[in-house]
């Protein structure tokens, strides 16, 4: 639920999450999200690919946040309607979903560890969106 709180604070319109392998949305989730679940629609779907296909067909660019690219996240344009794809902690964004994306964004890092946890990465890229839009 921590990502939902971050999404709400960043002004995200909607969060789309897979039905499988994600936390339940219940009273504990509401408490943990600091009320963010009251302010942002959550769409749970069994087939994430179909949801992303619909989003893309609706004119929203899809950008995957992944270390599997050379594109620095600061080089991409988030001023147009954008969907940010975040992967799982273990596997990242699947190759199937990467193919659907209009672009891939990498968070620049200076340390020896090549990745952040999903919660932190979500916050970093969402605040790049805010920076560009303001």
Region spans (language model):
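Post-transcriptional modification and biogenesis factors for structured RNAs
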Residues: 3-134
């Amino acid at each position: 639920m921590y990502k939902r709180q971050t999404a709400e604070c960043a002004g995200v319109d909607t969060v789309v999450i897979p039905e499988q392998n994600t936390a339940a949305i219940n009273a504990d989730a509401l408490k943990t999200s600091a009320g963010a679940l009251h302010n942002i629609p959550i769409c749970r779907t069994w087939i994430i690919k179909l949801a992303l296909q619909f989003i893309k067909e609706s004119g929203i660019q899809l950008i995957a946040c992944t270390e599997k690219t050379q594109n620095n996240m600061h080089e991409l344009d988030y001023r147009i309607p954008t969907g940010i794809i975040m992967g799982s902690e273990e596997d990242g964004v699947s190759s199937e979903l990467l193919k659907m994306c209009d672009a891939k964004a990498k968070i620049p890092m200076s340390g020896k560890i090549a990745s952040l946890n999903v919660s932190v990465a979500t916050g970093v890229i969402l605040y790049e969106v805010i920076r560009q839009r303001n």
